[in-house]
A protein has these predicted regions:
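Short, Lys/Arg-enriched N-terminal segments with co-localized hydrophobic residues
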Residues: 1-4
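Long, hydrophobic, well-ordered secondary-structure blocks that form the structural core
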Residues: 134, 158-165
Length: 357
């Protein structure tokens, strides 16, 4: 199909994959790996890889998912696509017109496009820093008859992202220094508790899934079956990082025992030593600390954990292109006090930092 010198070509996934990371807006939802995963799921009708050429050169490409609408009609969906240079939108009108005509030839009733673009940026206080960043692109779509609205079916994927830019830091220590005092205290505290992070292998994804399902039940969202995540891991390989934060139980018990003995020794030394004006207060403070450690020990016994690891939080991160994206995940509500998610995300920030370096 050729329109205004833009040619739309259907290609196999292997050919598509050769150039899929050549764009600034490269993302895993517009990858051949994701297309293969979608095809492996029975509820997906058809998935197609397209490239757009001008004068023999590829100027864009996209993965399209075709779905049934009201049993009779078919609709086309582009999540985080198409891939192209949005900084120079000269090709965009012709590209979209060519795509529309291509889909009409396939008797597609509707086309939904969710470009991977930032339109509004807010800070931590939800104050608007930048808006209408994609205004020029939006105008192109409007001229071609597209209506702009929030698709509730795709809101969890394309609505908002919490982004941590790290390109201004040269080391992880610099990034840590920029954190708030309270966050730095939490990282230090949770590390002292012997909370650790590891990457799960394909054989252990049930640990991730168990936490995800319980989080979904608690918060009221649906999740794919375990086989979806196993297939995702097979398709993306090392780019799909299933991360688990867990409590090292023997080390945690040793930490409690060490502190209990330390405060018992301190209290006895204060009682045996010279009784000064502030000694009584020091003893009371030490006894409060001692009781808190005994309380933690008794609380740990109620967990009835028989293994050396107590799973706390689990997240799936997609390491793709210039991004590391938190895609799915959750926490065990009973163990939020150990801060598993905090340390897990800090670990992945450091991973992303090492990747940049």
């Amino acid at each position: 199909m050729i329109v205004m010198s833009i040619m739309v070509k259907s290609v196999n996934f292997d050919d598509y994959q050769k150039t899929q990371t050549s764009y600034k807006d490269t993302n895993f939802l517009q990858s051949a790996e994701m297309a293969k995963l979608q095809l492996s799921r029975n509820h997906i009708g058809e998935v197609e890889a397209l490239v757009f050429e001008r004068d023999g050169l590829i100027v864009g490409q996209t993965i399209i998912v075709y779905r049934r609408s009201f049993r009779i009609f078919r609709k086309a969906l582009l999540l985080h696509g198409p891939l192209l240079d949005y900084n120079s939108i000269t090709d965009l009108p012709d590209l979209l017109e060519a795509l529309i005509l291509y889909l009409k030839k396939k008797n597609i009733a509707s086309l939904s496009i969710h470009p991977y673009l930032t339109n509004l940026i807010r800070n931590e206080e939800l104050e608007i820093l930048k808006e209408d960043k994609a205004d020029e692109v939006s105008k192109v779509f409007e001229k071609l008859g597209f209506e702009q609205y929030l698709d509730p079916e795709q809101a969890l994927v394309v609505n908002q992202m919490f982004v941590k830019p790290i390109d201004t830091f040269t080391t992880s220590d610099e990034m840590l220094a920029a954190f708030s005092p309270s966050l730095k205290r939490d990282l230090k505290k949770f590390t002292a508790l012997n909370v650790k992070v590891e990457e799960l292998s394909e054989d252990n994804l049930d640990q991730f899934y168990d936490i995800l399902v319980r989080t979904a039940e608690r918060k009221g969202f649906s999740v794919h079956p375990l086989t979806y995540f196993q297939d995702l891991k097979r398709n993306f390989g090392k780019s799909a990082k299933f991360m688990l934060a867990y409590l090292d139980c023997p080390a945690y018990l040793a930490y409690l025992d060490e502190n209990i003995k330390s405060f018992e020794t301190k209290i006895q030394a204060l009682k045996d030593g010279p009784q000064k004006k502030r000694t009584k207060g020091q003893i009371a403070d030490a006894q409060d600390q001692l009781r808190s450690y005994y309380k933690r020990l008794e609380q740990f016994k109620t967990y009835q954990n028989t293994g050396d690891k107590l799973p706390l939080s689990a997240y799936l991160f997609m390491d793709y292109g210039s991004e590391v994206v938190s895609f799915y995940g959750g926490n065990d509500e009973a163990y939020l006090n150990f801060g598993g998610a905090v340390l897990l995300h800090w670990e992945m920030l450091q991973y992303a930092m090492r990747k940049v370096i």
